[in-house]
């Protein structure tokens, strides 16, 4: 789920990442962070100055490790430092306007950015295939990245996938850093909170209201995907997919 505040926070996190991990020069890191901020926020005067001072990045839509992806890269020859961006659950997926502006901003700052269409996220479902695709794209990106490593960046659900992917043995030694904004770090607690409006604190169960309606819908759709294959799973998944993302009581369909 994208929120207006999360993307600026993401840039702050990635600014720190670039400063400590990808560039030896602190000043260069701050200049690149400014490129990303201006490219994403597009303030009128500064955006024009950025376009004059930097070359237009190249954006293309192509499969990476079998996953449809937007790839943004700087003009000119590489290799470049590389980022894999894991989006949150949004119907616009990899073509979300804010995400595309962010990718262009990173490309103007000298990064190659991969924005994969992770399976399930466009319809609010997080499944094992979502993680497998994150890992697969990161491996493919690292194969051609400068230094053979990539930075993993994610927002919301994508942040959780980025954190989990970085732990996978297939990416051992191939991740330069991870930056996650508003990730879900305890999936069991998230599902409990989303579906019941309660959470555990030690041995106690405490109420937490209001639980975000869309979070409950994502949790329910994701849990339905994990049920054994069969007509019951199909009926539940179909019913949940028919619920509007803005429904304040999305689980009423299960009553």
Regions found by a protein language model. Give the residues of each.
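Conserved alpha/beta-hydrolase "nucleophile elbow" surrounding the catalytic nucleophile
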Residues: 153-159, 181
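Alpha/beta-hydrolase-fold enzymes
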Residues: 23-24, 164-255
């Amino acid at each position: 789920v994208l929120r207006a505040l999360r993307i600026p926070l993401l840039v702050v996190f990635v600014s720190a990442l670039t400063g400590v991990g990808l560039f030896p020069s602190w000043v260069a890191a701050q200049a690149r962070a400014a490129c990303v901020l201006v490219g994403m926020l597009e303030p009128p005067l500064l955006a024009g100055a950025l376009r004059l001072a930097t070359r237009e990045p190249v954006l293309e839509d192509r499969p990476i490790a079998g996953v449809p992806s937007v790839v943004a890269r700087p003009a000119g020859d590489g290799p470049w430092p590389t980022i894999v961006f894991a989006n949150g659950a949004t119907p616009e997926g990899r073509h979300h306007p804010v995400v595309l502006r962010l990718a262009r901003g990173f490309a103007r700052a000298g990064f190659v950015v991969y924005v994969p269409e992770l399976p399930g996220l466009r319809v609010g479902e997080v499944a094992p295939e979502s993680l497998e695709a994150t890992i697969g794209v990161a491996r493919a990106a690292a194969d051609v990245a400068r230094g053979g490593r990539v930075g993993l960046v994610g927002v919301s659900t994508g942040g959780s996938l980025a954190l989990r992917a970085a732990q996978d043995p297939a990416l051992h030694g191939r991740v330069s850093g991870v930056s996650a904004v508003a990730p879900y770090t305890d999936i069991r607690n998230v599902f409990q909170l989303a579906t019941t409006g309660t959470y555990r604190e030690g041995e106690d169960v405490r109420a937490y209201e209001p639980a975000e309606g869309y979070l409950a819908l994502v949790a329910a759709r994701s849990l339905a995907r994990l049920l054994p294959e069969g007509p019951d799973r199909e009926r539940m998944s179909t019913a949940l997919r028919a619920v509007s993302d803005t429904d304040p009581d999305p689980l009423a369909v299960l009553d």
